Structures are given as C-alpha cells and as structure tokens.
Amino acid sequence: MAIEFKRSPKPTIGVEWEIALVDPESRDLAPRAAEVLEIVAERHPEVHLEGEFLQNTVELVTGICDTVPEAVAELDRALAAVQEAATELGLRPWTSGSHPFSDFRENPVSKKGSYDEIIARTQYWGNQMLIWGIHVHVGISHEDRVWPIINALVTNYPHLLALSASSPAWDGLDTGYASNRTMLYQQLPTAGLPYQFQSWDEWVSYMADQDKSGVINHTGSMHFDIRPASKWGTIEVRIADSTSNLRELSAIAALTHCLVVHYDRMIDRGEQLPTLQPWHVAENKWRAARYGLDAEIIISRDTDEAMVQDELRRLVDRLTPLAAELGCLRELDLVLEIIERGGGYERQRRAYQRTGTWIAAVDLACDELNELRPLEAE
C-alpha cells in the first residue's frame, strides 16, 4: 500500500472550525445545517463550508494560508456569513467542546455512507458524538519529518488541550472535567492518541494492515488526535476543543503553528526532538482533560512534573522570536491572556453557578461567538 504525501514547500497553515446551530428559545441543537450551507453557498460562494457528522453542524474551512492572521480573517468572514444565514432562519450559531444538555437521540447524523458505517460499527458511543473541535493543519516539506514532529507534538498535548478546554458539562451534569469531549472522542476505535511510529514506512505498513483488516473500510480513515494529512501535505492537529470565540481560536492556531515549525527547524539543525514515554503522554492527556489549566503535567522522560500554566508561559517566551517571524506574535501572546482570564470551561461553570441552569452557558457561548471574544455571563 503506497501513501503519497503531497509535500508542502512552506509551513503554511489551514484551520477547520466546527460550529453548531441552536434554537434561541430552547437553546437545544437544531439539525438545520443543510439550510445554512445552501444559503451561504448561494450568497457567499467564496466562503468554504462543509457539512459535518451531525446535521446541526457546519465546518468553517480556510484555504492554504501563509500566516495565522490570514487564516483568522478567513474564518471571520465565514462566521459572518453563517451568522447571517442562521439569523434569517431564526437560529443562533453556537460552539463549544460539547453541548451541556442536548440529547443525542434528538440529533440525527448526516446522510453519508461513511457516517452510517461509523454508527453501525460503534453503536452507542458513535451516537454520543455531540462534540466539536478545532483542527489545525501545518505544511510539512517531506514525509520523513512527519512522525518525528508528531512524536514531539504529543509532548505538548496538555498545553493545547488545557488552553482550549470548553466542555465541562454533559447531559445536564457537571462532569468534573475541563474537557469531557476528550474523554468521549477516544471511545471511537480509530480515535485517540497516535502511536509513536518511528518512520513514514512504519505508518504506511500500519495503514496497509488497517486496510487489510477492514478497519479503514468501516471508518474511512484514522481519526487520531494528531495525524498526517497526506492529501494536503500537512500534519493535522485535532487536540483542541472548539473555542466559543475567534480570539481564543487564534491563540490555539498560533501556538500550534509555532510548535510545528519549531520542531521542523530542530530537524534542520540536527537537534534531537523531545519525546515522552507513551504512558506519560496518556497521563498528560487525562490530566489536562480533567483539570484544564490547573493540571500538573509530566515534562520529561524522567517523570519530572510542572504546572501546565508555568510550562505555557515558558513556551510562549521560547517561541516569541519564531512567532514574530511567522507573523503571529499578537496571537501567540493571547495564550497568556487565556491563562490570566481562565479557560472556556471555567466561564461556562461560572455561568451555571450564577443561574443554576446550563442554558446560561449556551447563551454565553453564542454571545462570545457573535462578539468574537471571551465574555462573562451577566
């Protein structure tokens, strides 16, 4: 089995942002994405939207961008088009890592053969996927660099998840987790942490075995939290919960872009990239999902630990010169703003605590999406 990796001559960036629709009265999810897609396609053909797994969701997709600000500007225009169409239909755009109370039985899956296969195979867990995320693609010049960079990126898994965590509630309950989306998504058999392959050939051999055993026939592809996107010549980082505003998304995109390019440059210099033991990576994923920005994480193969907030500050300091070169210095600095203000999961909890209802958390996310920045519930 051959997998052709379409090499990217530059470390370009692309972003996919999953946005759902809610009823403004009930605040429940509304399975009317097809209507929004139709209106936007007719009025704004330059905007790239995709249908998604759920009939309540549209995905905003940028083109191939040179900088984070360019990608964010494209998402801003796409979001405005979605807002316009949704308002006309009597709906509100909303997004977060998960919806706090919607029932999966009331949220139909989109009509697509591969989606039907996933549900047929995964049953209860497949039906539970009322979750939304951000996917960041960064261009890679050669397939031999892909897995060394991915193996380094998983050392930063908790950093990206803690910053973006925005799914504390499920089925009307506070789960105690900052990112319940993370715990849900890994229930699918092809999702979760990537294996730490040592070469592109190992990856190709693995995919051949997945094909031979029928796994890919059922699912269409592997859905790892970080994976190669061979068709585009990118590494796709799928760790982040969907942020409910564009300002926080831009911080996630900037940190991701800088990390990938940082590790790529380390290869250029002949330096050894950082790695952790597989159990370290799994433990860090759980800690960030559970505690968010208050997580204590493992930072070395010797099992040394540090607070994720402190590690994020050190990362921003280390990556600042590179961010200036990549044109995303302002966006990278927003990482520090998230640390100081607190994450989306914290704002949702505060909204619930003030009102006694998760409806307030839905309203808050809708308002943030409209205002493009973090807010606090009144």
Swiss-Prot record:
Q: Which reaction does it catalyse?
A: L-cysteine + L-glutamate + ATP = gamma-L-glutamyl-L-cysteine + ADP + phosphate + H(+)
GO terms for biological process, alphabetical: modified amino acid biosynthetic process
Q: Name one GO molecular function term.
A: ATP binding
A Pfam family in this protein?
GCS2
Enzyme category, top tier: ligase
Q: Which UniProt keywords are listed? A: ATP-binding, Ligase, Nucleotide-binding
Q: Tell me yes or no: is Ligase among this UniProt entry's keywords.
A: yes
Q: Does the keyword Nucleotide-binding apply?
A: yes
Which InterPro entries is this protein grouped with? GCL_type2/YbdK_subfam (IPR050141), GCS2 (IPR006336), Gln_synth/guanido_kin_cat_dom (IPR014746), YbdK (IPR011793)
Q: EC number(s) in its UniProt entry? A: 6.3.2.2
UniProt function note: ATP-dependent carboxylate-amine ligase which exhibits weak glutamate--cysteine ligase activity.
Q: Describe the family membership recorded for this protein in Swiss-Prot or TrEMBL.
A: Belongs to the glutamate--cysteine ligase type 2 family. YbdK subfamily.
What NCBIfam families has UniProt attached to this entry? Answer: gshA_cyan_rel, PRK13517.1-2, PRK13517.1-4
Name the UniProt record assigns to this protein = Putative glutamate--cysteine ligase 2-1
Q: Which organism is it from?
A: Corynebacterium efficiens (strain DSM 44549 / YS-314 / AJ 12310 / JCM 11189 / NBRC 100395)
The organism that produces this protein has a lineage beginning with: Bacteria, Bacillati, Actinomycetota, Actinomycetes, Mycobacteriales
